[in-house]
Design a protein with these regions (language model features):
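Conserved small/polar residues in nucleotide/adenosyl-binding loops
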Residues: 183-189
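Hydrophobic/aromatic-rich, well-ordered segments within soluble, folded domains that form packed cores
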Residues: 30-47, 129
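Conserved tyrosine-mediated DNA breakage-rejoining catalytic core shared by Y-recombinases
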Residues: 42-68
Length: 191
């Protein structure tokens, strides 16, 4: 992130953003598509920098709101400083990582590990959360099936939260609700 060459600095900062937040990489959209963004398509209006924090607020994939605040300390201080530099002379509607696309980010990842992409890296981050969560429960193998299921669901929930996934109502929800209602309303017949 301290590269003197501006393009490489922007790519490295976008990659760090994905690492730090598990944000999707982002792609260009057609004008008729919803205005959702990811790392490479963030605009100045989507972040707020204070002296000590980086605040994100925007609509991500499927129109799910993404809000996150990162303290500007440790490695995040350099991240903060880079973002501050990138937005310094930009209008609210201008992209932070101008000239950088998902292709640039994926090419960078692939130069480190063959076939690595932002999507695969994000999956790795989520898997790491699940793995850590399960490792934190040393005696899970001796637990009941119900407790194992609880820990597995809890680990998956932590990964989903990190990735900003939100549950959606299933397409067949209305039909299942009616089925449940009819089942409960059916009166027993006399024998």
């Amino acid at each position: 992130m301290q590269n003197k060459e501006q393009k490489n600095k922007r790519i490295a900062t976008a990659c760090y953003l994905i690492y730090r937040t598990a944000m999707r990489v982002g792609d260009e959209k057609d004008p008729d598509e919803a205005d959702t963004v990811g790392a490479t398509t963030l605009r100045k209006e989507h972040i707020k920098l204070t002296e000590n924090t980086i605040e994100f607020d925007f609509l991500g994939k499927d129109g799910v709101r993404w809000t996150e605040t990162i303290p500007a300390e440790g490695h995040d201080k350099q991240f903060h400083d880079n973002l501050k530099e990138f937005i310094s002379n930009k209008k609210e509607n201008e992209e932070i990582f101008d000239g950088i696309t998902s292709r640039h980010v994926n090419a960078y990842y692939s130069s480190i590990v063959k076939d690595l992409s932002a999507k695969v890296f994000r999956t790795y981050l989520a898997s790491s959360v699940v793995s850590k969560n399960l490792r934190d429960h040393d005696n899970i193998k001796s637990e009941s099936d119900m407790k194992k299921l609880f820990h597995a669901k809890s680990a998956n929930l932590d990964a989903a939260i990190m990735c900003n996934h939100k549950r959606t109502i299933p397409k067949n929800f209305e039909a299942s609700l009616q089925t449940v209602s009819y089942t409960h309303l059916t009166l027993p017949t006399k024998a």
